[in-house]
């Protein structure tokens, strides 16, 4: 009898391929031995396990025995249980028949070939274990049909069964081997695509475009987005030549930009507001598709998209409610960034609510508005405050000048939290401030003094350092601009001590504002400049009257003296020689008229102008002498700096200054010339007086007759002098 082999799960060493092939080709004897060994194994295992599968109905018993051998060694335990009930009866009969037919033939060779049979059986078992892997990969529905195919394939190929690993099942291989996902195929373009046609298509404009109020709102929204700094790359279509992107249209078949959207709105190419939103989103999508999500320009596109969506929330409806004018809707839509009114749909209900509340409240007194012709602040500021505010105006212009633009541009306008994408700015900075706001407050006279101005400027830099930490660009710009401000503010003029009268005048002006006193001519006379001019006019008129009286009196006296001399000459026609000489001397040297006191000259505007223009050109020596002249009449507190105001100086002081500056020239001009006769001097004085009288219309019109009489007297005087000179020549 054949030896029984205990059933174990330990792996058996697989023989080499050459030994396996030689034994398979050894003949019927070797096959019989294999069949016997397989039958003995199956009989030994029948006590433990039931038959697994029915025999393969092959035409030859040798083939059928090999199939049974393969089935017993390859079939897994799970598959054996499935087909146990179906094949139990048929398999048992077939196996018994095969054993009864083969036992007489192989009984004699059992003892001889016991060792080879074991070896073959071991080889067959190992071979079957190796064939178990490809069979497990096959579907479970037909396990019997694939068993005979596995053996011939293995025999034909002659592969070494050791190459297939036995320690791990083949079903786990897909879990171990991880396959990378397929990468997207990047298209390779050889030729650039043509430029798409320009939008909109003028031949396919919609019949029912969006209404006018919606179009105006959307247009203003696009303009507001275009004013954003981050919208610069999206203002115009992409220039593929300038930007060196020839394959742009291969990736972007339908380009879009803000100017195209604006042109389509103006040409009424949109039927609904949603189409405008789609075009804007297409522009942002094209940017991210061509440049990538992480690019800087893609982030800029995201920021302007957020601003656009925030503004489009307030878009008016397509059909306005009844009783709403188009002008009201457009007024709401004209300024979407600064509009704070409620929507038009809520206007009717809000008006009703206000009317009901107004009826329940007590009526208040209505005060008339202030006159638009007068400024908001009629109180004149004193010189100290005015000088400080002038310096503040110069300082703000210096801070906002273009030469500091590299580091002052973040502070020129209020911070736009939407455009800069900093929604938490107002939470950190409680009191925002900028240079533009400071300049407008200066223009509106909202600062009382320079300290308030400095406080706001310091607030700008404080907010900058609070929101931007050290080391950031904006923080460094703030430090540079603050250094410019400190340098400029160090040159602020020192305020002069103000007298107590200024406080009294301020109180008077404040009381006048409270009482709303009307302005009259009497109030104008209180202005110092007008008072000075009025006093000068009165004084000049008095001086003119006195001068006229004096000159007329003197001329009449001279005329009377000449008449007496003529009468005396007529009585003395035959005198002696000595007497004639005496008379000749008397005629040649007529008695000098009494010396006239020169009239006090009148201070004119031209004289003041000449003095003021001459002062800057003086040397230090003359300037010191001029200051002494001023100090004689006016008390000056500060010796280092003298403010020369010609209107505040008295006339005598102005005359002294004029004589000091221009007196030498007059003497030099008169030294080289002969003395004019008294009549010519009088004529010059009269001409000067006439020029002064021309400045006053009233004096000229009222005293025209007296001037004519005065000229007649002068002419008579000239004729008498000529007669006297002719008589003296005849006597000689």
Swiss-Prot record:
Query: Which compartment or compartments is the protein found in?
Result: Nucleus
Please report the stretch or stretches of sequence annotated as the NET domain.
593-672
Name listed for the protein in its UniProt record: Bromodomain-containing factor 1
Q: Where is the composition biased (Polar residues)?
A: 1-22, 89-100, 327-338
- Provide the coiled-coil residue spans: 529-569
Its main subcellular localisation, reduced to a broad class, is: nucleus
Molecular function, one GO term: lysine-acetylated histone binding
Q: Which Pfam families match?
A: BET, Bromodomain
Domain Bromo, residue spans: 206-315, 383-492
UniProt feature, compositional bias: Basic and acidic residues: 370-380
SUPFAM superfamilies, alphabetized: Bromodomain
| UniProt biased composition (Low complexity) | 37-51
According to the record, the residues making up region (Disordered) are: 1-207, 324-380, 491-517, 556-600, 700-732
List the biased-composition ranges (Basic residues). 561-579
Bias-annotated ranges (Pro residues): 590-600
Query: Which of UniProt's keywords are assigned here?
Result: Bromodomain, Coiled coil, DNA damage, DNA repair, Nucleus, Repeat, Sporulation, Transcription, Transcription regulation
Enumerate the InterPro entries for this protein.
Bromo_chromatin_reader, Bromodomain, Bromodomain-like_sf, Bromodomain_CS, NET_dom, NET_sf
Function according to Swiss-Prot or TrEMBL: Transcription factor involved in the expression of a broad class of genes including snRNAs. Required for sporulation and DNA-damage repair. Prevents the spreading of SIR silencing at telomeres and protects histone H4, but not H3, from deacetylation.
Classification via Gene3D superfamilies: 1.20.1270.220, Bromodomain-like (1.20.920.10)
What conditions trigger expression of this protein?
Answer: Expression is regulated by FKH2 and repressed upon adherence to polystyrene and interaction with macrophages.
Q: One GO biological process from the UniProt record? A: chromatin remodeling
Skewed-composition ranges (Acidic residues)? 137-147, 718-732
Q: Which domain of life is it from?
A: Eukaryota
- Any Gene Ontology CC annotation: chromatin
Name the protein family. Answer: Belongs to the BET family.
The species this protein belongs to is Candida albicans (strain SC5314 / ATCC MYA-2876)
């Amino acid at each position: 009898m054949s030896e029984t082999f205990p059933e174990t799960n330990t792996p058996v060493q697989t023989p080499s391929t050459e030994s396996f092939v030689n034994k398979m080709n050894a003949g019927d004897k070797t096959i019989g031995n294999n069949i016997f060994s397989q039958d003995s194994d199956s009989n030994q295992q029948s006590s433990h396990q039931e038959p697994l599968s029915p025999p393969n109905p092959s035409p030859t018993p040798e083939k059928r025995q090999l199939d049974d051998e393969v089935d017993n060694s390859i079939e897994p335990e799970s598959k054996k249980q499935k087909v146990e009930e179906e094949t139990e009866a048929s398999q048992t009969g077939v196996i018994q028949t095969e054993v009864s037919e083969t036992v007489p033939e192989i009984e004699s060779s059992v003892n001889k070939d016991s060792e080879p049979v074991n070896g073959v059986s071991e080889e067959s078992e190992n071979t079957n274990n190796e064939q178990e892997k490809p069979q497990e990969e096959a579907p479970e529905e037909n396990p019997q049909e694939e068993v005979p195919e596995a053996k011939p394939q293995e025999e034909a190929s002659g592969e070494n069964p050791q190459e297939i690993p036995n320690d791990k099942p083949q079903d786990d291989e897909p879990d171990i081997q991880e396959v990378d996902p397929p990468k997207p195929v990047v298209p390779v373009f050889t030729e650039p695509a043509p430029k798409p046609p320009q939008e909109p298509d003028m031949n396919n404009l919609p019949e029912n475009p969006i209404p006018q109020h919606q179009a105006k709102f959307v247009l203003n929204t696009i303009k507001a987005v275009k004013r954003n700094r981050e919208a610069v790359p999206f203002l115009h279509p992409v220039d593929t030549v300038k930007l060196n992107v020839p394959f742009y249209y291969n990736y972007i078949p339908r380009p879009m930009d803000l100017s195209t959207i604006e042109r389509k709105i103006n040409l009424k190419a949109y039927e609904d507001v949603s189409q405008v939103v789609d075009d804007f989103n297409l522009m942002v999508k094209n940017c991210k598709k061509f440049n990538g999500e992480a690019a800087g320009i893609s982030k800029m596109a995201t920021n302007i998209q957020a601003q656009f969506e925030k503004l489009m929330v307030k878009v008016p409806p397509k059909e306005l409610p009844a009783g709403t004018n188009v002008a009201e809707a457009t007024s709401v839509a004209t300024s979407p960034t600064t509009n704070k009114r409620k929507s038009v749909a809520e206007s009717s209900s809000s008006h009703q609510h206000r009317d009901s509340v107004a009826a329940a409240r007590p009526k208040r007194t209505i005060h008339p508005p202030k006159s638009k012709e007068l400024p908001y602040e009629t109180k004149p500021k004193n010189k100290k405050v005015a000088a400080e505010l002038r310096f503040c105006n110069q300082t703000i212009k210096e801070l906002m000048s273009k030469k500091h633009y590299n580091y002052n541009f973040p502070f020129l306008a209020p911070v736009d939290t939407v455009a800069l994408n900093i929604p938490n700015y107002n939470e950190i900075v409680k009191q925002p401030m900028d240079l533009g706001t400071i300049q407008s407050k200066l223009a509106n006279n909202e600062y009382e003094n320079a300290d308030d101005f400095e406080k706001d400027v310091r607030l700008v830099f404080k907010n900058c350092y609070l929101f931007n930490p050290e080391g950031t660009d904006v923080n460094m710009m703030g430090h540079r601009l603050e250094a410019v401000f400190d340098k400029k503010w160090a040159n602020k003029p020192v305020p002069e001590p103000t007298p107590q009268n200024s406080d009294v005048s301020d109180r008077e002006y404040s009381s006048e504002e409270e009482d709303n006193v009307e302005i009259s001519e009497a109030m104008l006379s209180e202005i110092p400049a007008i008072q000075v001019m009025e006093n000068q006019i009165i004084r000049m008129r008095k001086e003119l009257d006195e001068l006229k009286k004096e000159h007329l009196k003197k001329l009449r006296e001279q005329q009377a003296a000449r008449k007496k001399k003529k009468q005396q000459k007529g009585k003395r026609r035959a005198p002696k020689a000595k007497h004639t000489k005496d008379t000749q001397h008397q005629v040649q040297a007529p008695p000098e008229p009494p010396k006239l006191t020169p009239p006090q000259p009148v201070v004119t505007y031209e004289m003041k102008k000449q003095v003021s223009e001459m002062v800057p050109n003086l040397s230090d020596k003359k300037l010191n002498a001029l200051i002494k002249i001023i100090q004689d009449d006016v008390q000056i507190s500060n010796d280092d700096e003298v403010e020369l105001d010609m209107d505040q100086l008295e006339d005598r002081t102005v005359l002294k200054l004029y004589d000091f500056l221009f007196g030498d020239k007059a003497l030099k001009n008169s030294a080289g010339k002969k003395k004019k006769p008294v009549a010519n001097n009088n004529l010059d004085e009269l001409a000067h007086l006439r020029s002064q009288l021309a400045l006053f219309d009233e004096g000229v019109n009222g005293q025209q007759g007296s001037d004519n009489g005065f000229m007649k007297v002068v002419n008579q005087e000239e004729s008498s002098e000529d007669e006297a000179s002719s008589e003296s020549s005849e006597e000689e």
